[in-house]
UniProtKB/Swiss-Prot annotation:
Its cofactor is Mg(2+). It comes from Macrococcus caseolyticus (strain JCSC5402) (Macrococcoides caseolyticum). Mg(2+) binds at E258. This is Phenylalanine--tRNA ligase alpha subunit. Transmembrane segments: none annotated. SUPFAM superfamilies: Class II aaRS and biotin synthetases, tRNA-binding arm. PANTHER family: PHENYLALANINE--TRNA LIGASE, MITOCHONDRIAL (PTHR11538:SF41), PHENYLALANYL-TRNA SYNTHETASE (PTHR11538). Tetramer of two alpha and two beta subunits. One of its GO terms (molecular function) is phenylalanine-tRNA ligase activity.
Amino acid sequence: MELKERLQALKSEAVDKVSQITDKKALQDIKVSYIGKKGVITGLMKEMKSLPNEEKPMFGQLVNDAKQTVESAIAEVEARIEAELVNKRLQSETIDITLPGKKLSPGSSHPLDRIVEDIEDLFIGLGYEIVEGFEVESDHYNFEALNLPKSHPARDMQDSFYISEEVLMRTHTSPVQARTLESRNGEGPVKIICPGKVYRRDSDDATHSHQFTQIEGLVVDENIKMSDLKGTLEYFAKKMFGEDREIRLRPSFFPFTEPSVEVDISCFKCKGKGCNVCKGTGWIEILGAGMVHPNVLEMAGFDSNKYSGFAFGMGPDRIAMLKYGIEDIRHFYTNDLRFIRQFLRLEDGGEPNVSK
């Protein structure tokens, strides 16, 4: 059989086989065996040496045409196979749009997160900066830099979770204040709030938890006075608990402030007449505060003759309990969705239907 006849026969044979293929692997095998580098049609090029010189160019063209014909047939079948695969996949993934959909349950902010965000927004509006710090803290920043020497009762091992002799879980967010002051190289102003989790060796009950949330504030600048602290706390109380709230400052003691005060607000339930919320006093304690102790400023590199400041600390847990009428702090940390979902109404500006 002449080369031209063999070429024609191989081309017809390849096209016929390709037309019967139904999967990609078999199609690839046909392609390799006929028009691959070692394919039978490609191999005819090597036999051109037996042809007269004047016929070689024409035969070479015929071989290329045959390869293109087979490639076109392969491409056509490949497209058909791909389309069939797509159709099968679509059929298997068919969605019955008449079936009822799955209800998406709306989520809500955790009540503690919401209170923290509200407090942050309030103080951001006053020009405060939010600063966060380490939950695992050094003894120096947790105590000594805050005017609590080694001999102070608050340093008792029974009151704190110590990891080593010089490392513990922070007992308040005040170390953030100490670190921030130190980082300012003795230059004011400083105006920050420090939210975060804190840890103490308390027995868990309705009003105590070994882990709780705290937010502390610090302002340091020239000529900061007690009246600045009082004005700030009055603003906070009115924005958080209602414009008709009044505050009362009672003398207290904190190692890192002097003078120190406990801050009460007039009861929002009985309007000062006395009830179960305020325990008959007409007042509710919400936070502690005071003027920054000169020792704290000096240890951080500030000139206490030039700079003064005030600090305050509050527990969002307690504020949330007061604001929403929650009687057990443990509800915040049990991850009970029945409790959390009661706060969905807050997302729409309503009040929660809280089960105490």
